[in-house]
């Protein structure tokens, strides 16, 4: 099996979107390929499973109805691997590898890290021959990306932002779909300096 980040989710006909919207999804990592590249293997690695939920007043997930699923419901609570706004450590002159999975049923994520570029090294189609440097990336439901972040700053805390994204019209249901405001989903904090300076492999 090819190496990379994959994911598990239900395949019960007629119930997939509902179960994914309620959080039934998990990452699956197959090792190999890029994992043997020295700078990649030396990077601090985290898997970020992005999900959104709608909760009732007691904090319980609301079971989405057919109308909400057809309308592309976006939950008001966004979690990252089950946490809200987690922090990830990066070393100065080190590398951070974020393995991103959009496990939301409808929400698109348009991600940007303050003060840093991201270097895409793999997609859900496999590893890239040459890393692609971007200032933001878009993840549709089910999409995956592996990115490297170089610890190029002297220190500080930098927010991983989800930027507004217009998914288009809801058709006969009216309205515009997608996030209209930017918000923080996680942050990167500098802790120490790498014993050996790292570079994004080319």
What residues fall within each predicted segment?
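Terminal connector regions
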Residues: 14-17, 153-191
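Histidine-centered copper-binding motifs that mark active-site loops
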Residues: 1-148, 187-202
């Amino acid at each position: 099996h090819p190496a990379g980040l994959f994911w598990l989710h239900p395949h019960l006909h007629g119930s997939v979107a509902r179960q994914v919207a309620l959080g039934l999804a998990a990452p699956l990592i197959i090792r190999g390929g890029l994992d043997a590249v020295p700078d990649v293997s030396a990077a601090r690695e985290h898997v970020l499973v992005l999900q959104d939920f709608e909760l009732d007043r007691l904090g319980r997930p609301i079971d989405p109805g057919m109308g909400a699923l057809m309308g592309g419901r976006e939950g008001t609570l966004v979690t990252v691997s089950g946490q809200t706004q987690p922090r990830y450590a990066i070393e100065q002159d080190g590398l951070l590898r974020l393995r991103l999975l959009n496990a939301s049923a409808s929400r698109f994520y348009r991600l940007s890290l303050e003060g840093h570029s991201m270097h895409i090294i793999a997609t859900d189609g496999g590893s890239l021959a040459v890393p692609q440097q971007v200032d933001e990336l878009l993840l549709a439901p089910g999409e995956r990306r592996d990115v490297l972040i170089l610890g190029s700053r002297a220190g500080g805390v930098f927010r991983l932002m989800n930027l507004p994204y217009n998914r288009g019209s809801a058709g006969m249901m009216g309205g515009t779909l997608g996030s209209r405001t930017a918000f923080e989903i996680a942050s990167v904090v500098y802790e120490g300096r790498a014993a050996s300076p790292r570079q994004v492999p080319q």
